A protein has these predicted regions:
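Core segments of transmembrane alpha-helices
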Residues: 17-23, 84-102, 122, 147-153
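Small-residue-rich segments of transmembrane alpha-helices in multi-pass membrane proteins
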Residues: 139-155, 206-208
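Hydrophobic alpha-helical transmembrane segments in multi-pass integral membrane proteins
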Residues: 148-169
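The first (N-terminal) embedded transmembrane alpha-helix
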Residues: 9-28
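Short, highly charged, low-complexity non-transmembrane loops/tails of multi-pass membrane proteins
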Residues: 195-208
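Short, hydrophobic transmembrane alpha-helix segments
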Residues: 25-38
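Juxtamembrane helix-capping/reentrant segments at transmembrane boundaries
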Residues: 65-88
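Membrane-proximal helix-loop-helix units in multi-pass membrane proteins
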Residues: 92-146
């Protein structure tokens, strides 16, 4: 079991380009023409997997950047480890996002509208980091600017301008999107940063 998990920790991200392309082709062929709103919900999945391809594979380096940048670590591999990254990404990006698409298919797109807000918020964080950390590239920035943010904003505009969601559902979707993004930030800054300080490899501790 440990060998299997260790293999997954090392290689899970390598399937992202194939998964993104395969999923995009399927939803383009079988969903787009039948239900465009549902298509936009499903499209958040391959868009985000493409985003992760940039973060972790080509050019990659997101763990190193995030640890030594936002988390203030002196180490590229801690406090956010490969295992930690796996358990953050898999439940949210590979379970919750597709599940929202499935639920939207059977029970209505209200169930998946939150993904557009989440995608926009998460991608916007890369733009914020670009300005905070010396206007330098961070892994995931290109996909965020060219794919995730435009797609997220367009999806929100399309749903609102066509009256596809009620005010209540819109507010609920905003809240869920914020909570999803905030949960990752809380884990990073309320748990991982204190951990790095406690274990002595945070920059503030290192300088002392």
């Amino acid at each position: 079991m440990n060998k299997t998990l260790n293999w997954l920790y090392e290689h899970w991200m390598k399937g992202t380009p194939f998964l993104a392309l395969y999923t995009f082709v399927l939803i383009w062929l079988y969903v787009r023409g039948n239900d465009y709103a549902l298509y936009l919900i499903w499209l958040q999945c391959p868009a985000y997997w493409f985003h992760e391809f940039e973060e972790y594979v080509c050019p990659g380096g997101f763990l190193s950047f995030f640890n030594q940048g936002p988390l203030g670590s002196t180490r590229p591999d801690k406090p956010l480890t490969k295992a930690g990254s796996f358990w953050i990404n898999i439940p949210l990006m590979y379970v919750l996002l597709p599940l929202s698409g499935v639920l939207s298919n059977y029970f209505g797109t209200d169930w998946g509208f939150w993904t557009a807000y989440y995608s926009t918020l998460n991608a916007s964080a890369h733009v914020v980091m670009f300005f905070i950390f010396g206007r330098k590239y961070n892994p995931g920035l290109v996909a965020s600017v060219l794919v995730n943010i435009p797609l997220g904003i367009y999806t929100i505009w399309y749903f609102l301008s066509n009256g596809l969601v009620s005010t209540e559902v819109n507010i609920q979707s905003i809240i869920v999107g914020i909570v999803a993004q905030a949960s990752m930030m809380v884990y990073g800054f309320a748990y991982l940063v204190p951990t790095s300080k406690k274990e002595g490899y945070h920059k503030s501790v290192y300088k002392v």
